[in-house]
């Protein structure tokens, strides 16, 4: 086998990945999706949340939850019924084993630095 036949696919892959990384603001077909676009995994969305309303609905990219909004803690599944909190907020939730397995541990976004009572 010729060395050219081995190196060509590697060079093409590096070129494709390099061009993709060099144009981060461009709208993507699979990654870098805007809010409202169909998604399969949270990693595809600019916002960091692939949201679905029910178990049979199509998931779409959505903004992260703001303070006092309902949220899901970060998990290993690709989609959320409620988006995780924005940066600087935490999702206060009572976790359970069943809730972790069935993705039904929900809470509300809170600012831990907020000192008002």
Curated annotation (Swiss-Prot):
It comes from Xenopus tropicalis (Western clawed frog). The lineage of its organism: Eukaryota, Metazoa, Chordata, Craniata, Vertebrata. Forms a 1:1 stoichiometric complex with pancreatic lipase. One of its GO terms (molecular function) is lipase binding. One of its GO terms (cellular component) is extracellular region. Pfam families: Colipase (PF01114), Colipase_C (PF02740). Keywords: Digestion, Disulfide bond, Lipid degradation, Lipid metabolism, Secreted, Signal. This is Colipase. Residues 1-22 form the signal peptide. It is found in: Secreted. CDD domains: CLPS.
């Amino acid at each position: 086998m010729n060395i050219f036949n081995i190196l060509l696919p590697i060079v093409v892959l590096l070129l494709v990945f390099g061009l993709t990384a060099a144009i981060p603001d461009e709208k993507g077909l699979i990654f870098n999706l805007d809010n409202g676009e169909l998604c399969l995994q949270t990693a595809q969305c600019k916002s960091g949340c692939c949201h679905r309303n029910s178990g049979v609905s199509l998931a779409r990219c959505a903004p992260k939850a703001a303070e006092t909004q309902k949220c899901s803690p970060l998990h290993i599944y690709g989609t959320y019924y409620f988006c995780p909190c924005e940066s600087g907020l935490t999702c206060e939730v009572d976790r359970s084993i069943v809730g972790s397995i069935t993705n039904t541990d929900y809470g509300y976004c809170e600012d831990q630095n907020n000192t008002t009572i």
